[in-house]
Design a protein with these regions (language model features):
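Short, low-complexity N-terminal intrinsically disordered segments enriched in polar/charged residues
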Residues: 1-38, 42, 136-138
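Short beta-strand edge/turn micro-motifs at domain boundaries
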Residues: 108-138
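Short beta-strand segments that buttress and anchor functional surface loops
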Residues: 67-68, 94-103
């Protein structure tokens, strides 16, 4: 199992949402799906473009299905290219340059994540791929 460190992220602000984001990345590296799910509301919705078509995941059971994909990640570095957050409502928009190790080798891509929080937990998560590992742009 990969050892998670805060060094997996760079350029993350020292804010409440910055700490939640760093914890999210740490939990991904630790492959702790249950703890990741605890960051979400029970009725959370995640919309993903990772597969070049929209996928919708609603509730804990479907979110678990989405996060099963992290089990193949052996390393992850996230460098923040853009960060914006608000406090009321509590929201986050982040664009990340990602490098990771998978069973197929090293992959580099760009993600764009947006979170809407309710009660300190993620209620809506837009998980978008903006540049795929093959270099194509979404």
């Amino acid at each position: 199992m990969t050892t998670a460190t805060v060094n997996a992220t760079s350029n993350v602000p020292d804010t409440k949402l910055g700490r939640l984001y760093e914890e999210h990345i740490r939990l991904i590296l630790a492959k702790d799906i249950e703890a990741i799910l605890d960051q979400y509301t029970d009725d959370a919705v995640l919309i993903s473009s990772f597969e070049k078509k929209p996928r919708y995941f609603r509730g804990r059971k479907q979110l678990r299905e989405h996060f099963q994909g992290i089990l193949g990640i052996e390393g992850l570095e996230s460098k923040i290219a853009f960060w914006a957050e608000t406090q009321n409502p509590e929201t986050l928009m982040v664009v990340e340059a990602i490098a990771m190790q998978t069973a197929d080798g090293e992959a580099s891509m760009r993600f764009a994540d947006s979170w809407v929080l309710k009660g300190g937990k993620i209620a809506i998560h837009f998980a978008g791929m903006t540049q795929y590992p093959d270099g194509s742009v979404a």
